Structures are given as structure tokens and as C-alpha cells.
Amino acid sequence: MKQQANLIRAGQVIEHDGRRWTVLKQQIITPGKGGAFIQVEMRDLKTGNKTNERWRTADTVERLLTEEKEYTYSYMDGDNIVLMDPETFEQTLLPLDLLGDQAPFLQDNMVLVVNLVEGDPVGVTLPAQVTLEIIEADPVVKGQTASSSYKPAKLSNGVKTMVPPFIEAGERIVVRTEDASYVERAKG
């Protein structure tokens, strides 16, 4: 399906130069002189290579339609993750690199959304937030109360994040899977 280049968004799958690409980032740039253009960072679905491409905003690109299907995460198998189809109970093997930076947030029995193009997996979406335990938290530095200060902490999955000063080691917090940022204390 053809669409204007200025409508490209992260997560979409497009066809360019006879290859399939998943869009990682996009930015519309309007220079002081000349027409606006869109800068797109994308990854080749076959090779995994990244590239940057520029189009004028009026150009058209071929967008591929993706189908979303829910799977349940089972376990890791080397550089792959094993997912189970909750309807048929069939197991599917996907490369871990489809998750990118979100891989450490995988939890047993987590429901993932797999994006498929013509039956081939092209991306995996995790839930927006997960609950994890703080295993290490720096002590509060006295006198840093004038502004909203955060301190470094290490989560149970090994990821480091910044948390408010009242959070201590052993507490459970909710973090965003997108950027590992603190959301709130876990309830219950």
C-alpha cells in the first residue's frame, strides 16, 4: 500500500529498493531553505543491517501491512526465544535480536505481540510496563532535596535505572520497557 513519506512511523514495515525494512526512527526536518524532508532510520529484515534514508515529504513509499498475533513467552534457547501460541499451544522460535534493547524485560508467561508480514515475524512488542525488584540502590545524598533528584538503582534483570530517593533495595517498582524509566512503586 502506497503512503506519503511524511506518514512513516517507527514500527512500520516498508519496502524500499526491493527489500523489506522495519522503521526504527523517523524525523521530519524543515531546513531554513528548501523543502521539508523526512530522515528515516531503518533495519533490513533479512540481514539486520541499519541504514538512514531521506525522502521529500511528498514522496511515496510502499508500506507493508502487518498482522499482529499474541504469543506467550516460554523460555530462552541460546540466541532465540521460545513462544507459545495460546490458542494452538504450538511453540515458535524467534531470534532474540527482534526484541532489541527490551530483551532483559522478558518474564515467564509474559504475553507478547508479534508483528508478522506474510507470516514472517518482523518485530515483537512487550507490555508497556513491567514490575521488577530493586537489588541495589545507592544511598540518598543529604541536601539534594531542592530539586527532584533521582539516584541510580539496579533492577533484578540487571538493568540500571534512576529512581526517587525514597526507593530502597528490596522494593518492587514498575518500569517502562521502552526506556527502563521508573513509573511508580508496585502496588500490593
UniProtKB/Swiss-Prot annotation:
It comes from the Bacteria. GO terms for biological process: peptide biosynthetic process. The keyword Protein biosynthesis applies. Pathway: Protein biosynthesis; polypeptide chain elongation. GO terms for cellular component: cytoplasm. It is found in: Cytoplasm. SUPFAM superfamilies: Nucleic acid-binding proteins, Translation proteins SH3-like domain. Pfam families: EFP, EFP_N, Elong-fact-P_C. Disulfide bonds: none annotated. One of its GO terms (molecular function) is translation elongation factor activity. CDD domains: S1_EF-P_repeat_1 (cd04470), S1_EF-P_repeat_2 (cd05794). Involved in peptide bond synthesis. Stimulates efficient translation and peptide-bond synthesis on native or reconstituted 70S ribosomes in vitro. Probably functions indirectly by altering the affinity of the ribosome for aminoacyl-tRNA, thus increasing their reactivity as acceptors for peptidyl transferase. PANTHER family: ELONGATION FACTOR P (PTHR30053), TRANSLATION ELONGATION FACTOR KOW-LIKE DOMAIN-CONTAINING PROTEIN (PTHR30053:SF14). Belongs to the elongation factor P family. This is Elongation factor P.
